[in-house]
Amino acid sequence: MGRKWNNIKEKKASKDASTSRIYARFGKEIYVAAKQGEPDPESNRALKVVLERAKTYSVPKAIIDRAIDKAKGGSDETFSDLRYEGFGPNGSMIIVDALTNNVNRTAPEVRAAFNKNGGNMGVSGSVAYMFDPTAVFGLEGKSSDEVLEILMEADVDVRDILEEDGAVIVYADAEQFHAVQEALKNGGVSEFTVAELTMLPQNEVTLTEDVQAQFEKLIDALEDLDDVQQVYHNVDLGE
């Protein structure tokens, strides 16, 4: 699959830790999930998935509780899920997922980030068809064969199971997130190094060193926007 998930998560967490941006993003996502359904994760599948993802980033309990309490308290703040698609240099493709309380603010900010950093926004659907919605799990302490056996016994289908730097990485269809995680937990997995819902590129491209530097600047500009939750792309950054 070309991506070292533990490295990517650690790099992202390291980048965001100084500003607590990652905590703020999870706080927003938890609030939205809790407000759209029940504030109890046992009866709200979407909320449970967000909380499981937040756990792998060590999001403080206080932030989680505050977001859920805000939803319980009947806050009238509403957010919209938005997806933008675009292109970077040399055939690179980018998907930007945002969660915003002001649609009129977000679109111009995303467009400006593209335009100022050598990219351009495309129309809806222009690149998403080249990505697959994917659940990704990372775990340690078991071999890929042991993980495969656990999943087979639970009758849960996955796309691939790989070993990476002492960890096992499991790829599955996005809608299988809960089924895969429950099967692994029932099979004795107590902690996950990675638990993500992502858009995985069907094919990756490589860029020359100078072009990659420009591309990374574009990705940084998009990720630095407050309304942006996730940025996906099809470039092999050598991580």
Curated annotation (Swiss-Prot):
GO terms for cellular component: cytosol. This is Probable transcriptional regulatory protein BBR47_14810. PANTHER family: TRANSLATIONAL ACTIVATOR OF CYTOCHROME C OXIDASE 1. Belongs to the TACO1 family. YeeN subfamily. GO terms for biological process: regulation of DNA-templated transcription. Keywords: Cytoplasm, DNA-binding, Transcription, Transcription regulation. One of its GO terms (molecular function) is DNA binding. The keyword Transcription regulation applies. It is found in: Cytoplasm. It holds the Pfam family Transcrip_reg. It comes from Brevibacillus brevis (strain 47 / JCM 6285 / NBRC 100599).
